[in-house]
UniProtKB/Swiss-Prot annotation:
The keyword Thylakoid does not apply. Residues 79-94, 150-154, 200-210, 266-328, 379-382 are vacuolar. It is a multi-pass membrane protein. The keyword Transmembrane helix applies. Its main location: membrane. It is found in: Vacuole membrane. Residues 1-57, 116-128, 176-178, 232-244, 350-355, 404-484 are cytoplasmic. This is Crt homolog 2. The chain crosses the membrane at residues 58-78, 95-115, 129-149, 155-175, 179-199, 211-231, 245-265, 329-349, 356-378, 383-403. Disulfide bonds: none annotated. It comes from Dictyostelium discoideum. Glycans are attached at residues 206, 302.
Length: 484
């Protein structure tokens, strides 16, 4: 039985061609429909954003995101700079003080010569007030830089939040400020979170990068900073519109001068920040070399055996050796980011207000600590999370949230209690270029309300009685009693 052989190529009939043509058209139509749907979804999303978010809101969001981003980078770079200058803390303190004087001075000079932003009234502001503020900020900066050398980045961020309870206490004493139970509860929770964060240092556990003495040295910086906050509320309460660059220049100038005379404290500090009186000039010279990328403290080996000498750095408990390669690059980038960071603070405060600024500050804290744990960002300076560090972070965030909510509720109640509250109080925010950003506290400055005259009180009394006093009668009363 022979098999019927089929042709390799069977002829196509008209129906097959027509079906294939229809399939191709259908596929093309489906592709077009899919593209139309994708375009319509994207367009609808764009229209939604355009209708729901105004140009002003979008601008505020951009400023807030840039503030948070620059704040995180600023904290990371600061710790990088501290680690580079571990052996030259006093030099680093002078660098972070004097480094801003020419920058702010150039801006102020330009404004005085080519703009009207700094009128004569501003220039006549008492210099002694700048001196006091600069002195307080100098002490704060000194403790921050010296203590921060042996305090890890994540712990620095947590300790910064302790300025809130310190400022609340001093505001209660000097400004007669009263706080709600929610605010007090938030402050107590923050204190609890700080204590939890310090447990590894207190118990001698995993303290890589931390020294208990310098952890508390860093924590002490919150006290003069809290005093500075309160002083600004007192000394600058009469200032209507102080040019921020003018203020920053004189604050940085006096902070630098006062910071220079703080070197005797180093005489009693433990390594690596100890410095005898006769070592001040050599320390400054070695710090300057480190800024230029030249190592002074290097490993010393026995020429015969090749072993590390007991007197060498990196031997046992001796000081670590210098690692100054590219130090000037890190410092320049840090100072540039720090200035931009403070500009974004001003923009957020101006366009969004203190409430949004507080929320952004709260968001910045966990993001910074997370960034410190990434090795691809911090390299050998990274600090992996531990159970206690996570617990401390969560507790402090809970306390910050409580404090912020309590502050907003308190302000709303005060506004509702008095129709004139907006004219009697204001949030006075005086930015300050510090090496790091502390926990933010709203200082309420109470404006002085002028006393009411006798005429005003008489008219108010008659009005409550429903008596309308003729204007001619009022003029006679004014001439007899006079306004006081």
């Amino acid at each position: 039985m022979s098999e019927e052989k089929l042709p390799l190529l069977s002829p196509l009939n008209e129906n097959d061609i027509e079906n294939d043509y229809k399939d191709e058209n259908l596929k093309s139509d489906l592709d077009k429909l899919s593209n139309v749907k994708k375009q319509s979804i994207i367009q609808r999303f764009k229209d939604y954003l355009k209708n729901s978010i105004s140009k002003q809101t979008a601008t505020v969001l951009v400023y807030v995101v840039l503030y948070i981003l620059s704040g995180v980078i600023n904290s990371l770079l600061l710790k990088k700079v501290m680690n580079v200058f571990t052996n030259y803390g006093f030099f680093l303190n002078q660098l972070t003080n004097y480094g801003y004087v020419p920058i702010f001075g150039a801006i102020v000079l330009y404004k005085i010569l080519f703009t009207n932003d700094i009128p004569k009234d501003t220039r006549s502001f008492p210099q002694w007030k700048f001196v006091i503020m600069g002195a307080l900020d100098a002490v704060t900066g000194y403790f921050v830089v010296i203590g921060g050398i042996k305090t890890t980045g994540p712990l620095q961020q947590l300790l910064n939040q302790s300025v809130i309870p310190f400022t609340m206490l001093l505001s209660f004493i000097f400004l007669k400020e009263r706080y709600s139970l929610i605010q007090l509860g938030g402050a107590l929770i923050i204190i609890g979170g700080v204590v939890v964060s310090l447990i590894p240092s207190l118990t001698g556990g995993n303290t890589s990068g931390n020294m208990l003495f310098y952890n508390f040295f860093y924590l002490i910086s919150m006290i003069p900073y809290a005093f500075s906050n309160v002083y600004k509320a007192i000394g600058f309460s009469t200032v209507e519109d102080m040019d921020v660059w003018y203020l920053q220049y004189f604050d940085a100038l006096y902070q630098s001068l006062v910071g220079t005379v703080l070197f005797p404290i180093n005489n009693w500090l433990p390594p690596p920040s100890d410095m005898k009186f006769n070592q001040v000039i050599p320390q400054l010279k070695a710090g300057g070399k480190c800024l230029g990328g030249i190592n002074t403290l290097i490993e010393q080996y026995n020429s015969t055996t090749g072993e590390l000498l007991p007197t060498s750095c990196n031997y046992g408990d001796n000081l670590g050796c210098d690692n100054c390669h590219g130090a000037w690059v890190v410092v320049l980038i840090y100072m540039a980011v720090n200035v931009l960071y403070n500009v974004f603070i001003l923009l957020v405060l101006k366009h969004a207000g203190a409430t949004v600024f507080s929320i952004a500050n709260t968001l910045r804290l966990p993001l910074t600590n997370i960034a410190f744990s990434f090795k691809f960002i911090m390299g050998s300076d990274s600090n992996p999370f531990s159970g206690l560090s996570v617990a401390g972070l969560c507790i402090i965030l809970l306390g910050l949230g409580g404090y912020r909510v309590g502050s907003m509720i308190k302000q709303k109640k005060e506004a509702a209690a008095s129709a004139d509250s907006s004219s009697n109080t204001e949030n006075k925010v005086i930015p300050k270029v510090f090496p790091t950003q502390f926990g933010e506290v709203s200082i309420i400055i109470k404006k002085k309300v002028p006393p009411k005259s006798q005429t005003h009180l008489r008219n108010q009394f008659f009005g409550k009685l429903g008596i309308t006093v003729p204007e001619s009668k009022l003029r006679n009363q004014n001439s007899i009693y006079g306004d006081q």
